[in-house]
Amino acid sequence: MKVLVATDAWHPQVNGVVRTLSHLATEAPAFGAQIEFLAPDRFFTVPMPSYPEIRLSLMAPGAVARRIGEAAPDAIHIATEGPIGHSVRRYCLSRGLPFTTSFHTRFPDYLAERLPLPERWTASMTWRLLRGFHAPSATVMAATPGLKAELQSRGFGPVGLWPRGVDAELFRPRPPTLALPRPIFIAVGRVAPEKNLEAFLALDLPGTKVVVGDGPARPALQRRFPGAVFLGARQGEALAELYASADVFVFPSHTDTYGLVLLEALASGVPVAAFPVSGPLDVLGGTGVGALDHDLRRACLKALEIDRVACRAFAERLTWRASAEAFLNHVTMARNTRRAA
C-alpha cells in the first residue's frame, strides 16, 4: 500500500510534526507500506510573515493534481492545515476520494500568543475553521487520549489515536558532557513565544538553566536572561548528549498537543518538570517519571528526586514502530470503508 502524506511542515524545519512523519516513513515498510510525501520541497515557497523559518507553498493551478497523479497512491493522509493540506483536501473532495487527517498543532492557543486580540475571539474563530477543515476526514488522528476527548467535545469526529514513539537507541543515558554548575535544568525546542520559555527562565532555581534550540524569541530572551545558557539548535548525537547531561528536563509549554521532547528526555534517563496541562498530563500523568505542578519551580525541584532508571524504562516501551502501525490501521480502515461503500 502506498500512502501519500500531504504536509506543509517539512525539512529543514525542526519540530515534532517533521520528526513524526520522518519516523513514520522509516517504519512503514515493516508493515508492507510505503510513505510518499507531498511537501514544500515540491513547490515554490515564501517565508511566513512573522515566522520566516516556516515556508508557505505557492502552487500553480493543476500542480497538486499532477503530483498526486504521478504518485498514484492507494490512500491519502493530510497532516497539516496549510496551503498544501487545503489543496489536497479540495482535490479529494472534488473526486469523492476518502482521506484521513491528523491534528498536530493547537492553532487557537498559538494565535492567542501572537495576535493582539481577545483570546475568546481568536479561539472561537480558529476552532470553527479547524472543525470545518477536518469535517470530511474519514478519521482525525490525535496523539493522546486527552486530545482525542477534547476534539470530540468540540465537534470533531470520528477521532482515532495515533500515539508517538521515541528512538531509544539514540536518546539514552550517557556520561555528562556539560561542565556547568549543577543541577542542570534544560529546555529543548523552538525558541518562540508559544513555548512559554520565559516561565522557565524567570524561575529562581539552583545550578544552571540551559536552552537548546533556536527561533524568533531567542535574541530577546538572551538579553533578558543573561544567566541562562543558550546553545542554539542541536540534532542527532549532539542533541542526545545534551539531554543526557541534564538533571531535569523542563517543559513550560501550555500549547503542545504532545511534546516529543518529553519522550526524548525520558529515554535519556532525565525526569520531566511541566505544568499539568494537556500533553504533559497525557504523557506523564500517573507514571511517576514527571513532576506536574502549576508552580513550575516546585515541579523542577520535585523532579530532582525522580529515579532516572524509571524514566528510561518508561520511554523504552514507546516505539515508533507501534506508532506507524496505529497510523496505518486508521488509513487501511478508511480505505476499506470506501471499498465496502
Where are these regions (language model features)?
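Short hydrophobic beta-strand element within catalytic cores of glycosyltransferases
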Residues: 262, 267, 271-274
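Conserved donor-binding/catalytic core segment of Leloir-type glycosyltransferases
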Residues: 141, 177-210
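Aromatic "clamp/platform" in nucleotide-sugar-dependent glycosyltransferases that forms part
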Residues: 254
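A charged, aromatic-enriched C-terminal amphipathic alpha-helix characteristic of glycosyltransferases
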Residues: 305-340
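Donor nucleotide-sugar binding/catalytic pocket of nucleotide-sugar-dependent glycosyltransferases
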Residues: 127-173
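Short alpha-helical donor nucleotide-sugar binding micro-motif in glycosyltransferases
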Residues: 134, 241-246, 327
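Nucleotide-activated donor-binding/catalytic signature segment of Leloir-type glycosyltransferases, i.e.
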Residues: 219-238
